[in-house]
A protein has these predicted regions:
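Helix-breaking motifs and short loop linkers at transmembrane-helix boundaries and internal kinks
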Residues: 28, 60, 81-86, 98, ...
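Glycine-rich segments within core transmembrane alpha-helices of 12-TM secondary carriers
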Residues: 119-145, 168, 411-424
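Extracytoplasmic
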Residues: 1-31, 47, 136, 299-304
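Extracytoplasmic gate region of multi-pass secondary transporters
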Residues: 16-17, 208, 212-242, 280-323
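Cytoplasmic membrane-interface "Motif A"-like loop-to-helix N-cap segments
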Residues: 58-69, 341-355
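C-terminal ends and interior cores of transmembrane alpha-helices
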Residues: 70-83, 355-370
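Helix-to-loop junctions at the C-terminal end of transmembrane segments
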Residues: 48-60, 332-345
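C-terminal membrane-cytosol helix-exit motif in multi-pass small-molecule transporters
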Residues: 165-188, 212-228, 246-264, 448-458
Length: 484
């Protein structure tokens, strides 16, 4: 049930992309405005994933996911009722909050599966959930055409988008009444302090502050983009006001982080070796998620138009080709987790896959209209496989860093995926597709080197149970599957 909850959040999150061209024509949007809406769709997911991670660790996945699914109906209906660019900006910013749903399932899955199986379990969850992007790309246009009789014969995109929100809200109620946070007899571990991530060294505290600044920077970049002359959504004075508010948010985050970690910083508290972790490892996973999921977000948003314009294809044909990218998640993301489980080293799995991402996008840089279309598709799918397998490999490591803070760590890592999406799409909006592909390829190459030199193998990566828990007997495991 959890993967389907994730699937629905992705259907909602990406329900605009299949209709971008149609909506642009009906509401007289410029190409720059359509690109900007793609960035808006990702923006609030950045802080939302961190906030959702905190709520998740405190209240559990059952309550958190249920409320998020019900909330999804709000931006879906707002998008369906939009009459101009300003309405769409607001609705897509709100939709970014729905994109934070992924984090919830990471904690839920980690509660039900031991470390030795976490890679494939998280991969299946993520693969089927990300399949929602394909579901939106492939099925929503069909629904819109089928409902055209309610729209004077024209594609009824408003009905299709509204329907996704209604279904999500209904499933939110079903989810709340059908799942539990942990197997029977297992205690849901909560962090001792709330409001910010608890770190275990002074160096990690400063690394956390730098990490928080990066996310604020991405939001500031979006504000700058919305203030450009060809967008006309924010004035210069409004942009400066947004920057001031973001500076205040950063100051508040820093204050909360200080409150949570005050005893450590003033020397009153030290952590025993069994409780320590390096935030540097979280930061490296954040970078890996920039290069894999961040690039996936960017490519999913621009690929239909890329094939349409590069090869002169019909919109429907280009959309079906582009839909193969998220469709591949069914295979690639679980395989990344499975390889991480079976290869014997999660570190080197992450390193090699990051290198594959680099090769794929650097090859995609050279795609142009002279290429045979099948070859262009093959190169795109090569890059897609490694990017999506990288997501699976990243989240085969994230839940193993500090169990009781899994929600917050997953939220931070996930937020940087959206950071990557915002930065990459901003680069794309200012340049072209070949520049975007080369930028993503170079970033992945740097990431591969950093993982090879600095990423550490998590403690007890392939254990039968988390530290402090008894290994589950076969009988208990079968009970878990039955009760799910």
């Amino acid at each position: 049930m959890t993967w389907f909850a994730f699937f629905l959040t992705f259907v909602c999150w990406f329900n605009f992309a299949p209709f971008a061209t149609t909506i642009g024509k009906q509401l007289n949007l410029t190409p720059e405005q359509i690109k900007t809406l793609g960035i808006c769709n990702l923006a609030l997911t950045i802080p939302a994933r961190i906030i959702i991670g905190m709520l998740l660790d405190r209240f559990g996945p059952r309550i958190t996911y249920s409320l998020l699914l019900i909330f999804a109906s709000v931006p879906c209906l707002a998008t369906a009722l939009s009459q101009n660019f300003e309405h769409l900006v607001i609705s897509r910013l709100l939709m970014g909050i729905v994109g934070a749903g992924f984090v919830v399932g990471i904690r839920m899955v980690s509660e039900w599966f031991p470390p030795k199986e976490i890679g494939i379990a998280q991969g299946i969850y993520g693969g089927w959930g990300n399949f929602g992007a394909f579901g939106a790309e492939f099925t929503l246009p069909t629904i819109a055409v089928a409902a055209s009789f309610m729209n004077g014969g024209a594609s009824n995109w408003r009905f299709a988008i509204a329907l996704t929100g209604i279904i999500a809200a209904i499933y939110g109620l079903i989810y709340y009444n059908s799942v539990q946070d942990t197997p029977v007899g297992k205690v849901y571990k909560r962090p001792k302090k709330n409001g910010a991530l608890e770190v275990t060294s002074v160096k990690s505290f400063w690394a956390l502050i730098i990490s928080n600044f990066g996310l604020i920077f991405a939001l500031g970049l979006l504000a700058w983009r919305l203030a450009q002359k060809n967008i006309h959504f924010l004035t210069q004075s409004q942009m400066y006001l947004v920057w001031l508010l973001l500076a205040g948010l950063f100051a508040y985050q820093t204050y909360k982080a200080y409150q949570v970690n005050k005893e450590l910083l003033i020397g009153k508290k030290t952590y025993p070796p069994s409780e320590r972790y390096q935030f540097r490892q979280v930061a490296l996973l954040e970078f890996t998620y920039v290069t894999n999921f961040g690039s996936e977000l960017a490519v999913v948003s621009m690929l239909p138009a890329f094939f349409e314009k590069t090869f002169g294809l019909e919109h429907v044909v280009a959309g079906m080709i582009a839909a193969a990218y998220p469709f591949l998640n069914l295979i690639s993301r679980p395989s990344g987790g499975l390889i991480s489980d079976k290869f014997g080293s999660r570190k080197w799995t992450m390193t090699i896959i990051s290198g594959g991402i680099a090769v794929g996008y650097l090859m995609a840089h050279f795609i142009n209209s002279s290429w045979p279309i099948p070859l262009a598709i093959a190169v795109t799918m090569f890059a897609a496989y490694f990017a999506q397998a990288g997501c699976g490999a990243t989240y085969s490591i994230a839940p193993l860093i500090k169990k009781e803070a899994t929600g917050q760590i997953a939220g931070n890592v996930g937020a940087y995926g959206n950071f990557g999406g915002v930065v990459y799409l901003t680069i794309f909006s200012l340049t072209d597709a070949s520049t975007l592909f080369s930028t993503m390829g170079i970033a992945a190459m740097i990431c591969a080197f950093m993982c090879g030199f600095f990423l550490k193998e998590p403690k007890d990566s392939f254990a039968g149970a988390y530290e402090g828990e008894l290994a589950e007997t076969p009988t208990k495991r079968s009970t878990i599957f039955t009760e799910e």
